[in-house]
Structures are given as C-alpha cells and as structure tokens.
C-alpha cells in the first residue's frame, strides 16, 4: 500500500477541514466579571483578628512581628468567605497543624465554584450574548480538589449546555491567571467560533492556620492572600456591533526559572495547604523578568521596546517587594504599576484571580478617563503571572479603543 501524500484527495480534505476549524483572527478579551465574598477585614486590624480567632493572643512578640508584616504589605483591606463566628466552628482549621483537610474541603468544594459562577454571570451579562453560545469553560483554583471537579460544578450552576468543553486547572498558584489566559487563547484561535469562559476562583481558607514561631512563611501568606473570583469571555473574530473586544491576546509564553523550585512551594497536607517561601522570591523574579519580556516580543517578530515605560503593565502583585524590585529592574515610572497597586490595596493577593482584577481595573479607569485605548491609552502591554516553580507567565496584549 502506498503512503498518502499531500496531493491525494484525502489529504487535501483533511487540510481543508483543518483550515476551516481555525479562527481567522487573534483571540480577544470580550468581557470581564469579578466577585468577592461579603466579609471585609481591614489590614490594620488583621493581626488582632488573626491572633484572636486562632487563640494565640498569648504570643505577644509574634503578634507584634506579624502586625509589622501586615503594615508593610501595602494592603488596605481583604475580602473573605469567613468571619469570626464562622471560624469558631472549626478550631482544627485555626490551629497550626491539626488534621483539618476534610473541613477545609467541605467549605471550598461548594464555595469555589459558587464564587466563580458569580463572577461568570457578570462577565456573561457584559458580553451580551446567550450563555448557550459558550463553547469552552476553563476553571482554575488552588482552593481544594474534588471529582466531579470545579469546572463541572460551575457549568452546572451556570446552566451551560451539556456539551460545553470543560477544562480544570488545580493547584497552580499565583501565576495561574496567565496560564488560563494562555489556554483560552489557544482554544479560541484553534476552534472557529469558539467562545471561551475562563474562570479563576480562590478561597484562602484552604491555607488558613494559626501562627507558629518557627514557621513565619505561613504567617506571611496569611498577611497577603484574600478571596476573590474573576471571569473573562475570550474569542476570536468578534461579531461587529454585538461583541466589544478590549484586548487582543497576541502571544502567551510560560518560563520556568531553573533551580528555583524551593523559592516558593506549597504542599497539601492533612492540616491544609502549607506555604513555604524564601526571601529570594523578589530577586529571583526581577533578575529573570527582562529575558521573558524580550522572548515574548521576539517570538512574534517584534523588536522589544528600548524603554519599558512605553507599555501598559498588568503584573501579578505577589507582594510589595516583588513589585518594587521588578519596577526598579525595568526602570519603570511609579505610575506604571498603578492598576496593580490599586488592586493589591483594595483586595490583597487573590492568587490566580488577581491579574484579571487588574485587567478589569485598568480597562474601567481607561474608559472613565476617556483614553484612546483600554490599556491606559497605550497600544501594547504585558500581563505577568508569578508563582511556584518559579514560573513566569508572560502575555503580550494589544489594546483596542473603547466602543
């Protein structure tokens, strides 16, 4: 039997099918929705709250140290799905290392998809098309694991059609907002007519625990992380007059920094999600960020800008030190991280959902100020995810004018 060549009718049919399956244009962000739980705790009072609910007020010196950590975070307040009365029912969760994973999962398994669905409803409403037109769902969380997974539960809550193509991304941490955008780009561009609902939802009770003198890492995590969810509608070839694209997702790349996996790592144990971080996290990211930026520009045949201030910026706010050191390394003006610092102040670090909140903050402020594009009036920008591995997600965005 002879081999098939490109000239055979069958191969031509396959090539035609493949061409017809692909979209003509670049993936675009068409709508954004966000949601957060009702309980607000100010950062100024968080040390009092934290040491009270964990029955640790006798640890006077540790509390003073934790309060200093909180005051340096540049966070004003955070939202949580718990309050003091709620936590009184779970003394195992507020201990440092008592077995508590079952209780944490009992809270997160229904809570994560519900919060994600709340954000998704807002994105779908802004999009303005029927939810039956959603072809793909990508759901991301670090708030527990279960089967059927959170994507299934979110689709069920939203009433999406039963043949929606679902994807679930568990336990990726703080870089995952960029990861989900990378998935959404590939799905939208390789499936003609696809409309991808991407959802990131996080509940930090999976990692909440009492303070321990010999484990300051978890205390740092408790000073930073907040609860929240964000959803985007992503698709190529927008329908003129119906869909309103804001950003084109031009390129999406992931980079793992060699020999850095011990810088930030987390482990799911019987006592919940344990957080470990060294003081090298900010330097590790800032020392490698420029190479990632150069790579993403060169991969699409563009010359990297001589001045990084010519771009708009959506970096994940892993913490104040990370933002400060990246800003210094790239010689950025302070206002370039304005949207990120606003979200950090208003919500804290919401893990995977954070960069999507920042995208929302930027486009809303740009539109309100009457700027020429949703990207602070600029044409090109980058979205950056930082997290365990150490992993960097670099997304090259092209901003469009408000309509």
From Swiss-Prot:
Enzyme Commission designation: 2.3.1.-
Binding site for CoA: 281, 318-321
Originating species: Aloe arborescens (Kidachi aloe)
Gene that this sequence comes from: PKS3
Full protein name: Aloesone synthase
Annotated site, Determines the polyketide chain length and product specificity, chain positions: 207
Keyword Kinase (UniProt): no
UniProt keyword annotations, A-Z: Acyltransferase, Flavonoid biosynthesis, Transferase
PANTHER family membership: CHALCONE SYNTHASE 1 (PTHR11877:SF80), HYDROXYMETHYLGLUTARYL-COA SYNTHASE (PTHR11877)
Pfam families with a match to the protein in the record: Chal_sti_synt_C, Chal_sti_synt_N
């Amino acid at each position: 039997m002879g081999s098939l060549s490109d000239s055979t009718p069958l191969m031509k049919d396959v090539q035609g099918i493949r061409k017809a399956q692909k979209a003509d244009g670049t993936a675009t962000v068409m709508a954004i929705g966000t949601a957060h739980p009702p309980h607000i705790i100010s950062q100024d009072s968080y040390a009092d709250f934290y040491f009270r609910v964990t029955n640790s007020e006798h640890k006077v010196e540790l509390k003073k140290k934790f309060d200093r950590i909180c005051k340096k975070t540049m966070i004003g307040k955070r939202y949580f799905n718990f309050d003091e009365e709620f936590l009184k029912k779970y003394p195992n969760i507020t201990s440092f290392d008592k077995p508590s994973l079952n209780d944490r999962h009992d809270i997160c398994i229904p809570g994560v998809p519900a919060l994600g669905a709340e954000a998704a409803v807002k994105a779908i409403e802004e999009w303005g098309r029927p939810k039956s037109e959603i072809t793909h769902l990508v759901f991301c969380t670090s708030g527990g694991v279960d089967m059927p997974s959170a994507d299934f539960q979110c689709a069920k809550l939203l009433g999406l059609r039963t043949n929606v193509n679902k994807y679930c991304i568990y336990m990726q941490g703080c870089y995952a907002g960029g990861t989900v955008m990378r998935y959404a780009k590939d799905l939208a561009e390789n499936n003609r007519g696809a409309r991808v609902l991407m959802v990131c939802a996080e509940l930090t009770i999976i990692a909440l625990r009492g303070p321990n003198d010999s484990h300051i890492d978890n205390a740092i995590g408790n000073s930073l992380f907040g609860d929240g969810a964000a959803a985007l509608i992503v698709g190529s070839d927008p329908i003129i007059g119906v869909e309103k694209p804001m950003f084109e997702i031009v390129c999406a790349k992931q980079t793992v920094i060699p020999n850095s996996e011990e810088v930030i790592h987390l482990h799911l144990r019987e006592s919940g999600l344990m957080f470990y971080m060294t003081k090298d996290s900010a330097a590790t990211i800032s020392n490698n960020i420029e190479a990632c930026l150069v790579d993403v520009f060169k991969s699409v045949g563009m010359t990297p800008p001589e001045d990084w201030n010519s771009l708009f910026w959506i970096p994940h706010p892993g913490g104040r030190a990370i933002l400060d050191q990246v800003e210094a390394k790239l010689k950025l003006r302070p206002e370039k991280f304005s949207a990120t610092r606003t979200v950090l102040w208003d919500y804290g670090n919401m893990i995977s959902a954070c960069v999507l909140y920042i995208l929302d903050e930027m486009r809303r402020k740009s539109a309100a100020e009457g700027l020429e594009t949703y990207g602070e009036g600029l044409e090109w920008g980058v979205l950056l995810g930082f997290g365990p591995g150490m992993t960097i997600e670099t997304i090259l965005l092209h901003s469009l004018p408000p309509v």
